[in-house]
Amino acid sequence: DYTTSTPEICYDDPARLDFNFLAGSPPFSIDYSINAINQTPLTLNGSGNQQYTITPAPTVGLNSYDVIKVTDGNGCESVPNPSNASILVNPTPEVNITVSGVNPICEGQNSELFFPVLSGTPPFNVNYLAGGSALSTNIDGTGNQTTGGPMIISPTTTTTYTLTSLTDSKGCTNTLSN
């Protein structure tokens, strides 16, 4: 048997191929391809359930893994059924933070924060700092809050807004350093 325990992952998460060797003698050599490009054969030394973590991680999008043949330690060949597994890799979510209204503002005025979406699957949970205070909001695919419209801000002192992390609806997270 041949499957994957990770049919949908986030970019840079481990992708795994699962094999269940019911017959034959280890070690098992597996000739396979990724998206129709032949790869260096894998060697798995055990029998029964075996797992292989794909390195490097697959690219963003749908990746097809086809087993061409399995050769056991005695030279006996077979092709598993099914012989194909697919892994969907979701992109790392990315947004910017911009002031879309008046900047700078005077005391008593307000402005708008907007979060232009660059990649990922909406809605998003955005964590940010406002003058050192940790806050969060949910945004849609257009960069507005899911409650509608941009975020209205009216700080009473000069305030710096900094994105710290972003998580999309697929659970993919981007921890930001700036």
Set out the residue ranges of the language-model regions.
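Short glycine/proline-centered coil/turn motifs in the loop regions
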Residues: 22-26, 118-121
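Terminal edge beta-strands and adjacent linker/stalk segments
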Residues: 75-92, 171-178
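Proline-enriched interdomain boundary motifs that mark the N-terminal boundary
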Residues: 1-5, 91-101
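Short beta-strand elements bearing conserved aromatic residues within extracellular beta-rich modules
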Residues: 28-32, 124-128
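Solvent-exposed segments in extracellular or luminal domains encompassing
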Residues: 43-65, 138-162
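Beta-strand-rich extracellular modules
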Residues: 68-73, 164-169
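Short, solvent-exposed loop/linker segments at the N-terminal edge
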Residues: 6-13, 103-109
